[in-house]
Regions:
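Small-residue-enriched alpha-helical segments and adjacent helix-cap loops
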Residues: 76, 80-82, 92, 96, ...
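Mobile "lid/hinge" segments at catalytic clefts and subdomain interfaces of large enzymes
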Residues: 144-264
Length: 441
């Protein structure tokens, strides 16, 4: 007799057995699933607050990926010998999990939802990041939360022209391709990767091959849901108020919204749109139908945003011009000024229309490389690209801190440049590039 209602699904996947288990641990979470491949084990949980927040204009989903040092028999670095703030790898993997699952929740879901993927065992061969995508999806599938369909994560490598699904760490060292993707039963839902000058048709073939190969992971989640899933909560998306939408469209036309959307400069257009919104709000307050309706008044911004999208789309289709007046083939004016900083090792100011980036390069010795703790041991980096997006670049006031988005965008640019940066004993240097966004439209 056991106190656990444990349900598992085990199947052969590539060169490994994969097991999905639920009902044994984290039973007070809304949903929990343990996924194991080799000796790498990931526990994913999802919890939704029972008190919903009304009136939010976004889905309050938080996704965190955590690597426990004990998973590889290691001590955390630092004085306190305890896991601290997320590493760059953990932050990037959190974003990797977030992207495929976020669109599968229904629009308008008001509950705060937290997905947590914890690496609790690592064999240092089978990568835990792609397992975490599958584990997170399975946890949500098992929970009462509405969720469109199961997705699974995978990595595609290529050695000697042959694709490999979920290659080991050793195999990845020889691969000229590193694609991380997520797929449902019938479509790709997320792709991220890097390669060493691989032709486009190879990438397309790899993705189609990977989508087919990963289906056992999707099917296993569906089966596990049938065996152990909780009853899904009832959720009816809030329907748009057709009468209010029509009234605001009428007011927007009279307030000059279309003319405001034709202002070519971003900040001037922003001011013009603000004036239009103020006119619409004042008109609604004077309207006997909506004057006392706080919900209607608070939804004006969202509805105007919806109307603006329609206006811009119609203009592109009917006139072939974009929001700033350009046609669909004209590139914004570009100006590049190299050597703009007198004491930096390398610098350039890149301006394209109302978007501007100051890029600065610093060259150091091998002692300047970045040393990082990881489950596979100490890792060093000799090339790094850091991306900063300060609030003044879009004319806003916000706290100054490094966001997940900045870390993600920096990693994306770093992947693009890494293949052309010299490495090895013939180049015993460390290179750091910083991209400072000074303007953005």
């Amino acid at each position: 007799m056991t106190m656990f209602n444990k349900v598992s699904r085990t199947f052969r996947f590539g060169d490994n057995d994969v097991t999905l288990t639920t009902g044994e641990v984290a039973r007070q979470a809304s949903g929990a699933c343990v996924v194991q491949m080799g000796d790498t084990v990931v526990l994913a949980t999802v919890v939704a607050k029972k008190e919903a927040k009304e009136g939010q204009d976004f889905f309050p989903l938080t996704v965190d990926y955590v690597e426990k040092a004990y998973a590889a028999g290691r001590f955390p670095g630092g004085f306190f010998k305890r896991e601290g703030r997320p590493s760059e790898h953990e932050t990037l993997t959190s974003r990797l999990i977030d992207r495929p699952i976020r669109p599968l929740f229904p629009k308008g879901l008001p509950e705060d939802v937290q997905v947590l993927a914890s690496v609790i065992s690592s064999d240092q061969e089978n990568e835990s990041d792609v397992l975490s995508i599958t584990a997170a999806s399975a946890a949500v599938m098992l929970s009462p939360l509405p969720f469109a369909e199961a997705v699974a994560g995978g990595r595609i490598g290529r050695i000697n022209g042959q694709f490999i699904l979920n290659p080991t760490v050793k195999e990845m060292a020889e691969s000229d391709l590193n694609i991380v993707f997520a797929a449902s039963a019938d479509a790709l839902v997320m792709v991220e990767g890097e390669a060493t000058f691989v032709p486009e048709d190879v990438i397309i073939d790899a993705l189609e091959w990977g989508r087919k190969e990963i289906q056992p992971l999707v099917e296993a989640q569906v089966k596990l849901r049938e065996l152990a899933g909780k009853a899904k909560m009832a959720f009816t998306p809030q329907e748009d108020d057709a009468a209010l939408l029509a009234r605001i469209e009428e007011l927007a036309a009279g307030a000059g919204l279309e003319a405001a959307m034709r202002v070519p400069e971003k900040m001037a257009r922003k001011d013009a749109r603000k004036l239009v919104k103020e006119k619409i709000v004042e008109a609604l307050k004077a309207d006997p139908t909506y004057g006392e309706d706080e919900k209607a008044l608070s939804s004006v911004g969202d509805i105007i945003g919806h109307i603006e999208k329609k206006v811009v789309r119609k203009r592109i289709l009917d006139e072939g011009t974009r929001i700033d007046g350009r046609d669909t083939k004209t590139v914004r004016p570009i100006e590049i000024q190299p050597g703009i900083l007198p004491r930096a090792h390398g610098s350039a100011l890149f301006t394209r229309g109302e978007t501007q980036s100051l890029c600065v390069t610093t060259l150091g010795s091998s002692t300047d490389n970045q040393r990082m703790d990881s489950l596979t041991g100490d890792v060093t980096k000799t090339f790094m690209l850091h991306y900063n997006f300060p609030p003044f670049s879009v004319g806003e006031v916000k706290p100054v801190r490094v966001s997940r988005r900045e870390i993600g965008h920096g990693a994306l640019a770093e992947k693009a440049l890494k293949p052309i940066i010299p490495a090895g004993d013939g180049f015993p240097f460390t290179v750091r590039v910083v991209a400072e966004t000074l303007e953005s439209n």
